[in-house]
Structures are given as C-alpha cells and as structure tokens.
Amino acid sequence: TEIYTLSLHDALPILLFKLLEDSKSNSNKDKPTHFAVIFDSARKNFRNEIYYDYKANRSEAPEDLVPQFKYIRKSVEAFNLPSIELINYEADDLIATYSEQVLKEGAKVTIISSDKDLMQLYKKNIRIYDPMKNKFISNEDIDKKFGVSPEKVVDVQALAGDSSDNVPGVPGIGVKTAAELINQYGTLENVLKKAGEIKQNKRREMLLENKDKAIISKKLVTLKKNVPVEKKITE
C-alpha cells in the first residue's frame, strides 16, 4: 500500500531528518512512498475576500523566529524535498486537496502537523501525527478537543469561532456549547434553522442575530478539497 506524507512547514525542524530517515529505511514497513512539504504562500488568501478581517489580528512572528523560515526553505531545497505552495490558498487547503487525490488513488495519507484545523480531515486512511505531542491523533483526541466527531468539527468551529484566526463565530457560544448544539441538531445549518426553538433566551437571541456570522465562519474554517494544484500527486 502506498503511503503519502504531507507535512506543514512548522513541523520541519523536528521532522525533516526523521522523514529522510524513514524514507530510506528498509525496516519501516510504514515508510512513505511519497511525501511533500506544504507552505503557506502569503498572509492573505481567498478567505480575506469572504471576510476582510480574517487573521487580521495575527501579530508578526518573533524576531528570532523569522530568520529560521528561510533556513527551513533552504533545507527543503538542499535535500531536494518536494515542496508546494499556491498563491491565494493556505497550506491546509493544499493538504486537503492532495489528501483527497491520494484517497482516490487507493492509497493512505499521513499528515504531520499540530494544527487543530486539520482535524476535520481525519477519517479512514487519513491519519494525523502531532509532532509537538509526539503522537498520532485519535478520534478520542478530536472529541476531547471539539466534543464531536471529525466530520462535524467545522460546524463547531463555525459556531464557536476562533480568536487566533479572527473567525467571528456566534458571540457568547464557546466550543462546549457549540458541540452541545451540533450533537443535538446535527449540523450548523440545522441549528440555525431551529434556532427559534431553543429555550435558553440568550443563546436563542445570539443565534438568531448572528446567523450570517455563523455561515461566513463555516466558509472560513472549511478546508478546500478542490484547489487547482499545479503539481500532480505522483510528482
């Protein structure tokens, strides 16, 4: 079985040599047959067209960290590792797109990243390795983080919002309440449809008044799986 490994650049300092080692080792039965390093191309992307202030609150990277970025790219080039980025899209969108392509080829994917936004991709034949925790993410980890199964993560994020990315969500609704609502009503769309029936006054009012924010938020947090990537998965 072919195993494709997709890695976000933030994992590189820990995993650059590990990837190389695994790719050459004959003893590792799960060694990747293909892998790529995925970079963000720029701060702004198509999501800023949906919501201008998306990630607008992000501060600049610490001064001592900035020089490392170019060394990461240089390391990737020096080791002749395939790297991919695409203007107007985030690295997460490319990972989502390539993951779907890999599944269509009947192969498996390992995503190496600590980014919680990638948890929505977790399913059969797609596993996620968190280099910060040195472990593979499980269904239980995702449930502990978001209170729902992987396919409903975006619905919880849409309601709760995300202050780190400036995703608005619905004011007054956190992850716990969002998970409660999604587990009860199934989807964000159904929550909004049935919002008038919710007994808690404040919660009902917030949902009714902020439907548009919730809908926009879901568009922001949902990863694109059909990005017009230039490189084929076999490259």
Language model feature labels by segment:
Residues 6, 11-112, 116-136, 213-216, ...:
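Noncatalytic, basic helical substrate-engagement surface that gates or grips nucleic-acid strands
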Residues 25, 29-36, 79-81, 104, ...:
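Non-catalytic nucleic-acid-binding/docking modules located in mid-to-C-terminal regions
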Residues 1-3:
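Short, well-ordered junction/capping motifs at the entry into regular secondary structure
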